[in-house]
């Protein structure tokens, strides 16, 4: 199945109790556990439980709000996730969810300025500070529920790179690509795909003008290489609100938006949450 058509599997695949039709946003009644056997690598999995239930994923407690919780599988996840639910009254159930393996392409990019492929020693400390700031922005665990809404695309343009591709930059192997690149022209508007709170908005060495938006429960999206940032840290955003413009700042060969998704520090595939677009490829 194409990655562009897996939203329903990702968002609705983990149902820990039956949800009546038309009851979105209402916690289901306590009932038998029904969990699919798998979710693809890179998926954000959203589950629902009954009132008062507590949830642990791989032994760690996760936030439950209005019956909803989530967790994610990274690009290279192989181990099954153990989901343990304790219902109000003490009854517990446990289910295993296995990450389904995906095949990722190799992508070669040449013509990058050498200082961005092999940064000089004098900028390595800045790169470390940048990474720390991004990590702090992605570490928020708020009780907002925007992550469970339907995402829209933040800008228009062809997809030039997909999640998970193994990158070779100027002939040198580097870590995989963890975003979706949208080849929009410089100055094209970027909008919020769902509601959220701005947690980071600054110029970083490798990713240029960069923004991180918190969507609740540890789910965040990031926007890289922007030419302009139109909002500030702490702003609450509505879906469709303009947040900046497409650019070519940082380590790039041309204008585009690199759009990313995280569950805390786990890097996920934002395309799995986005509606399919005509002409997109798997």
Across the structure, where does each feature detected by a protein language model lie?
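A short, sequence-level motif marking secondary-structure junctions
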Residues: 66-69, 98-102, 226-229, 273-276
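Ser/Thr-rich low-complexity repeats and stalk/linker segments
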Residues: 26-44, 48-101
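C-terminal segment of classical bacterial N-terminal signal peptides
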Residues: 19-22
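Short, charged/polar, Gly/Pro-enriched secondary-structure boundary elements
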Residues: 78-81, 103-107, 266-268
């Amino acid at each position: 199945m194409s990655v562009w058509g897996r939203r329903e599997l990702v968002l609705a695949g983990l149902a820990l109790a039956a949800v009546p039709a038309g009851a979105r946003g209402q916690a289901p009644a306590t009932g038998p556990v029904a969990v699919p056997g798998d979710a693809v690598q890179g998926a954000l999995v959203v589950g629902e439980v009954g009132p008062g239930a507590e949830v642990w994923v791989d032994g760690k407690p996760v936030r439950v709000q209005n019956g909803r919780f989530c967790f994610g599988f990274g690009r290279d996840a192989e181990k099954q996730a153990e989901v343990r639910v304790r219902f109000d009254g003490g009854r517990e159930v446990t289910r295993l969810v296995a990450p389904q393996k995906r095949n990722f392409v190799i992508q070669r990019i040449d013509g990058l300025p050498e200082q961005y492929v092999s940064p000089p020693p004098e900028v390595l400390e800045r790169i470390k500070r940048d990474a720390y700031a991004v990590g702090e922005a992605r570490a928020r665990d708020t009780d907002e529920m925007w992550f469970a809404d339907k995402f829209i695309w933040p800008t228009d343009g062809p997809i030039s790179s997909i999640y998970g591709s193994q990158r070779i930059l100027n002939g040198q192997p580097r870590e995989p690509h963890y975003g979706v690149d949208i080849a929009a022209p410089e100055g094209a508007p970027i909008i919020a795909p769902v509601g959220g709170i701005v947690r980071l908005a600054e110029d970083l060495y490798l990713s240029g003008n960069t923004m991180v938006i918190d969507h609740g429960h540890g789910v965040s999206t990031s926007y890289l290489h922007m030419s302009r940032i139109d909002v500030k840290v702490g702003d609450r955003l509505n879906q469709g609100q303009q947040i900046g413009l497409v650019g070519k700042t940082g380590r790039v060969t041309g204008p585009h938006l690199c759009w990313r998704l995280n569950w805390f520090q786990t890097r996920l595939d934002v395309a799995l949450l986005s509606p399919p677009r005509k002409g997109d490829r798997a």
